[in-house]
């Protein structure tokens, strides 16, 4: 959600700033802007509604020469998408960009209006610009003005300030919204995501909660929430430099779907041997923590929540440990009871999901024995603040609709559940070997699922003119139906719902008619015959059935029911396997409908505000 890029350099920074924004397009936005101090210390600001390309074209047509600048992509929260509401915002000599939500902006706006400030936008961000300008009147430096401003702000923010009268300096403040500083030679940078800066540096410092930093070409000085000078660890990133390249694929989502076999190999490398899960790969002290776990609480949002819902079945059936799963935005506001020896697990692709991060911090206060995150971004807030971090290693995921991050989350969870069950003496060596063997086979099985791409593309034509779709599953395949439903609604804008198939009689059957496609996930398991009865209930009411069925399940196509016969796979990895056709179906339906597959309307990749 929103993207920030900043630079202080001897060279011209316009191209660096715009390229940084381009690399952050996947996060979702509706407008973009840049502000640069030129060689005469005049502020040159360009803002555009729409894509970064429109901003880039505007900057190219009137090149800006200058070494200090800030840039931003905005995802509207306060105020409609418009050029007037686009960042950077200006107050006197001060320019500001900001991610997050200032919760007391109405009070501050009224206060500033009493002081004579005139607001040109509907945003909460403009409040910060005017506050910094006001504080600078009495402060000794921009740093002091930003520190005094930050003390007045309530809510989440990652903000950058630039002063026309102090042209080789940026000051940044972070509270609840991530910011990273990129270190160069005689130049320094900042961004909301290190991906924005991988073309200019590999050395990064991640700001912590409450940090304020002063950045010049030669120095970075960081101060904590109390104003004390602090040092932050410098890390070297090995993230993919060309992650923003689609290669031979039409969309990033398509690319990421087809990257899943390789991503899963990376996820499992060094974590499983021929027949065991390597407990030490989870992290130092993991073995002792796992032995004491009596309950697991999973907290997540969106696709990650669906992964958690799937893993719940594994925790209880395989490891014998009770497990609850809750949406982070609900968990953090509920008066819950912390069970003894309860392990909190957070799931997040970005590691910066605002509600999930807040839930982690709350859980620490409430006495959870330990906290682990399953995450895709090293150095993210969830990774830094958790006791254990089990990385998914999916590689950079650009498409807003998550694909490889989901399947690698599931594989990571299955490895963790196996390790937990082993440490607690519930999973014996024979069962562990069966699970590990199925994991070794998984990348090849995913390749087989991807081979259905063309047949699913033809199937997608049936959905293009539909307005609603129902997804059904039972047991651990109910969350897979949930994920299929989420993918379809995210990128095709078709209203889709998922139900446990046994719930049909309790409401959903009222929706069934000849215009309602019903997608069913039908592996071979102990619930197959029950599921077949549910399918017959839909057929009897004229529903259009599309059944993704195990080859051993005994389905035959008939009027009103199309069967997509899938290879038989292990019961342990079947939920991961059946995710892939759901992804392909959603992708091809969206393609036919002509929607923006990689950046669907109103959505953002990393939800860093509540």
UniProtKB/Swiss-Prot annotation:
Q: Which GO terms describe its cellular component?
A: cytosol
Where it mainly occurs, coarsely classed, is cytoplasm
Q: One of this protein's GO BP terms?
A: protein N-linked glycosylation
SIS domain residues are 286-426, 459-600
SUPFAM superfamilies from the UniProt entry: N-terminal nucleophile aminohydrolases (Ntn hydrolases), SIS domain
Reactions the enzyme catalyzes: D-fructose 6-phosphate + L-glutamine = D-glucosamine 6-phosphate + L-glutamate
Summary of subunit composition and partner proteins: Homodimer.
Identification of the protein by name = Glutamine--fructose-6-phosphate aminotransferase [isomerizing]
Where does the record place the catalytic residues? 2 (nucleophile), 605 (for fru-6p isomerization activity)
In terms of superkingdom, the source organism counts as Bacteria
Q: Which organism is it from?
A: Photobacterium profundum (strain SS9)
InterPro entries from the entry?
GATase_2_dom, GFAT, GFAT_N, GlmS/AgaS_SIS, GlmS/FrlB_SIS, Ntn_hydrolases_N, SIS_dom, SIS_dom_sf
* Coiled-coil boundaries: none
EC numbers for this chain = 2.6.1.16
Task: Report the function annotation for this chain.
Answer: Catalyzes the first step in hexosamine metabolism, converting fructose-6P into glucosamine-6P using glutamine as a nitrogen source.
Q: Name one Pfam family in it.
A: SIS
Domain Glutamine amidotransferase type-2 stretches = 2-218
Keywords, A to Z, come to:
Aminotransferase, Cytoplasm, Glutamine amidotransferase, Repeat, Transferase
Quick check: keyword Magnesium in the entry? no
